[in-house]
Structures are given as structure tokens and as C-alpha cells.
Amino acid sequence: MRAALKWLGRHGLRVVAVVVFALLALGLVPECCRPGSVVLPRLSPILSLLGALGARQWAGWAVLLGVPLLVLSFFRGRVFCWRFCPMGFLAELASKLNPWGRGAVQRVPALNKALALVIAVTAACGYPLLIWLDPLCIFNGFFAAWREPLAWASATTGTGFVAILLLSVAVPNVWCHRLCPLGGLQQAAQDLAQRLRKRKAAASPADMSAAKVARRTVLAAVPAVVAGLTAKKGLGPNGAKAVRPPTADPARINALCARCGNCMKACPYGLIHPDLGTTGIDGLLTPVIRLRSQDPDQEQFCSQSCSACTQVCPTGALRPLAAQLKEQGRFAPIGVAVVRKDLCVAWAENKDCATCDEYCPYQAVKLEKHGDVNCPVVDPDKCRGCGACESNCPAEPIAITVKPLPRR
């Protein structure tokens, strides 16, 4: 009993942090506290500051949420890791399951600062690689899987969480001490602060050790610059292969997306799912839209009145979209509807059917007279790819489907 109380005395704050962050991520809090699930990933300067840098956009006050942690790191180093980080605490508990492997971490090179440098430099290039390694977004992504309706594909957002725990059992403390980029960023900030203090106190400003460190940093940054610029020019697929949520930039979402699962949790219709390979390896677990939800009682298309997913992205992969603009169709299309004339009741069977025209909220479907029957034709300039036509088409198989827009 005394040992348990002693343990709680040392780690009580970390336990509270895990519980609070988990409740926020799950949304099991009062309505007034629901924005906390959006705030959690943005507490990391990797997602808030470097994400905004990579997206080249100012996302309001939320960008500043990562500033306190970054400033604190200059004075207290990795205090967030050792006192508050929920992912780090769980990884530490998992490490205790293998007391025989405690020394194994010493054989693993410290990559955390290098990973933080890669993210920072590639963000400056406009294509932030590896941003999804942030521990807060990994923690958040695991709890994003527990949403209604449950789907095994959605559970894949928690693979990083499980992988870190398994890795911590195999090589105790390897995540926190060797791999975590957020820890590396905090350590780099503390190292910089200490170096500046030593330089100021030194009698001679020419510090050879500092010069060596600076030289190593420059040498490490060069490959990151090359990777960022090369990826920005197009390491991904040549064309979009999936319908993305509104405001997503198909050319950069694979890099900007943190795989935190916020957009999937926010969608009230359960239409957003993690990609499982249709957009290439670099697009794994990024959000894609499936225009037929699992709940037949809910709307099965991207509603004209909903822009919830665009309000919760911590990195700018989805840009905020005002509900009024969504209703008016003043946003970039997420896809375009295509009529299969061989399957369409009007075109193939000469029977009157105007269901797609009736349900289209953007008046993108017009009827053209062919013989005695009015047949649907899609105006690609008006179509936003919402899928209202597809989800209500009475034909079997469906005669009108939303196709992804080709990448420009």
C-alpha cells in the first residue's frame, strides 16, 4: 500500500494527464469542453507551429497553442515529457514489462533530434515530412478509432499507438529516449539555450565545440532540404485516387496530415475514413471520403450544411471552411459526379427518372431531352462532389458516382 501511494505521489500528475487527454480525445466531456479534443494535438509545436509553416497559412489563435511548450523547453528541457505527455507515460509503463531489456536502448542511436530537424526543415520547404510521428497526434489518433459507427478501417488510426507500446516492450524506453521528435525538439531547444548561455559567459566567443555542433546541424539539414523540395515536386501519385474532405489540397495532404483522426471523429455522418493505400504509400491513413455511411438512418453524403471536419484539423491539411460558403458552393470541389449512361434508368431504359436532379443541392444536374425522356447531365463547373446524387440514385448498380478530381 505504501509503495502504491509513493508511486502515485511521483506519477499522480501523469496519470491525471492521461485520463484528461483520453477523455478529451474520446469526446466524453461536457459540450462546452469538446473543443479540447482539437486543442490536444495543437499543444505540440510540431503540429501547431511547424504545421502552420508547412501549410503556409495562419489558422488563428490555435497556432499559438504550441508556443508555451516550446518556450518552456528553453528553460526546463523535456519537462513536458517527464510530467505531462500521455504517450510517453504509457510507453514508459510498457517498458517496465521487460526488465531484462533495459540496456538495449543504449545500442540504438539517438534519432529524435534528427527527426525533429527533418520535420522543421521540410516544413520550411512547404512539405513537412514525418509530421505524423508527433506523440500527441498518435495518442489522439488511437482514440479517434473509438467512434460510432465502429469500423475496423477506422481503427487503423491507432496503429502508431500500438506500435509504440510494442516497441517499448521490445526495447524499453526507446521511444522517449531515442525516437520521439517532440522530445527531440524540446531537447534541441534546451541545448540551444545552454549553448547561448555558455557562449555569453565564455571569455572567448569562439567556441570550437559549438562550431562543431553547428556544422553537424548544417550537414544534417542538407538531406532534409533535398527531401522536402523533392517531395514537394511530387513523390506521390500522379493523380488523386480518392475523394478527399473539403478544402484538402490533394498535392500536399499526404505531408500535412498528422493522421490524428480529428476529422474522422468530427464527421457527424461517418463518411471520413483512413486511406489504406489507394493514394500511395505516402498517403496511408490520410482522410478519404466514402459517400455511403454505415448508418442507413443518417445522411450518406457530404452535407451542404456541414463543415465540421475543416474546423478541427491541427496542421492546416484541411483549411477552415465557413458553413455559409459551404452552403453556397463557394469552395473547391472534392470530386465530380459522372453519369453511367449504360446503367441510368433514363438513358438506358427510356424511363423518366430525375432523382439526382432533385437531390443535388448545388443545381449541378440538368435534364436534357432525349426522345421523350429527360436525361440527367452533370455540369462539372457547378458540381462540388458532395455525393447527394450518388447516395440517392435508385438504379442498381448505381448509375451516378462521384469520381476524384485529377491532380493538377
Per-segment meaning from a language model:
Residues 1-408:
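Non-ligating segments of multi-cofactor redox enzymes
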